[in-house]
Amino acid sequence: MRISQLEGKAVALWGWGREGRAAYRALRARLPTQALTVFCNAEEAREIGALADAALQVETDASAQALGRFEIVVKSPGISPYRAEALAAAAQGTHFIGGTALWFAEHAQADGSVPGVVCITGTKGKSTTTALLAHVLRAAGHRTALVGNIGQPLLEVLAPQPPPAYWAVELSSYQTGDVGRSGARPQLALVLNLFPEHLDWHGDEARYVRDKLSLVTEGRPRIALLNAADPLLAGLQLPDSQVRWFNQPAGWHLRGEVVYRGEQAIFDTADVPLPGEHNRRNLCAVLAAVEALGLDAAALAPAAASFRPLPNRLQLLGSVDGISYVNDSISTTPHASLAALACFARRRVALLVGGHDRGLDWHDFAQQMAQQAPLEIVTMGANGPRIHALLAPLAEAGHFGLHAANDLEHAMGLARNALGEQGGVVLLSPGAPSFGAYSDYVARGRHFAQLAGFDPAAISAIDGLGVH
């Protein structure tokens, strides 16, 4: 559905975060007199009132009855379509659509194809991979957009001039379904990995996997690039797409610190500023994507050495009094915390874990701690007591020191004291979202930086967003 098709219809926007505001501006630019209603909270309603838009109404009760009055509801990604009020309104005939679907419909050609668009998703690593892809494409001299879930809503860059040659688009599991619903077919879709996350939004693991994979099952990209090492992807059948693989011996894969293409050694990653084996494997994905676009990936591989790592992702802030502080606030699953820990296997580490409780299973994490644990673990947040109880028997057996904190500031003090004069690494890799304590993971990362004695503003920006 294109924006022009909304004209004259009963249209509402649900959500007034950055995505919601981007949708409003895009609709208003194309449909200046279209009547619109925004569903938002009371504080946001006051902000909207200052816009002085006579064709804009505000409601704060997004009930099924209220939503059901509209033909089209443009929904912000963070609002689950599985909420009872959304399902009830849909049953009454309301059509829910996201800004991502509108953008793809605007850019699709007559046959549905969207040339130059690379969509990237995965449970973890998608932001770094998307940014790295944009970096490599720009190094090759191509004007490239870095947009999507990484921090720039697609509707904020609806029609940039001159248009980019390539679009590196990060999509969360909240957005992947929009691609198929738009009727568009991206040139390439890359799926990095899959393990449970956002179960509160999706409802259960099976639905999460289905929604995530809808990018390739319903979006029908011209080329689907998949991780051969992921068991949830390895058997996937996609008859409408050309399927390519990375992380397998015949293609782009990692041996030690060296990237190979088949049996040919291509690039030593020792100087690439991407900590962790998982990040080096994602470099293989980027090079496979570059190759799939018809470019010389082997020649472009060295460009990765000049990539600047993203904030809040295994970000080394610096050292104070013999203690290094690493900000991995983006970590919102136990698997992500394990991957972060693996980067510091030979260091004295105090790990800070815990946050909003989404009901994820921490038993695998606990089993790993029994085999290769950090020196100290500090639990915090709403799920902190649950994690603490799970780890307590291992701590009592002498595998690691275990501490319970009331909040991040308390956790920092406990971690410093536990490391003592010998120093080490304080690693914030919570394995849980920040909801309830912070507005988002960025705010949590900034607070961590501040508590560690660093300027939070100086470490928070993502380089290269938008079209360059």
From Swiss-Prot:
Q: Name one GO molecular function term.
A: ATP binding
Protein keywords: ATP-binding, Cell cycle, Cell division, Cell shape, Cell wall biogenesis/degradation, Cytoplasm, Ligase, Nucleotide-binding, Peptidoglycan synthesis
Question: Record keywords: Cytoplasm included?
Answer: yes
State if Iron is listed as a keyword.
Answer: no
Q: Where in the cell is it found?
A: Cytoplasm
Q: In which pathway does it act?
A: Cell wall biogenesis; peptidoglycan biosynthesis
Q: What is its EC number?
A: 6.3.2.53
**Record-linked Pfam families:** Mur_ligase_M
Which reaction(s) are listed as its catalytic activity?
A: UDP-N-acetyl-alpha-D-muramoyl-L-alanine + L-glutamate + ATP = UDP-N-acetyl-alpha-D-muramoyl-L-alanyl-L-glutamate + ADP + phosphate + H(+)
Q: Which residues bind ATP?
A: 122-128
State the similarity comment: Belongs to the MurCDEF family. MurD2 subfamily.
Where does it primarily localize?
cytoplasm
Protein name per its UniProtKB record: UDP-N-acetylmuramoyl-L-alanine--L-glutamate ligase
Which GO biological process categories is it annotated with?
cell division; cell wall organization; peptidoglycan biosynthetic process; regulation of cell shape
What GO CC annotations are associated with the protein? cytoplasm
Signal sequence residues: none
What does the record give as the function of this protein?
Answer: Cell wall formation. Catalyzes the addition of L-glutamate to the nucleotide precursor UDP-N-acetylmuramoyl-L-alanine.
InterPro entries listed in its UniProt record: Folylpolyglutamate_synth_CS (IPR018109), Mur-like_cat_sf (IPR036565), Mur_ligase_C_dom_sf (IPR036615), Mur_ligase_cen (IPR013221), MurD (IPR005762), MurD2 (IPR043687)
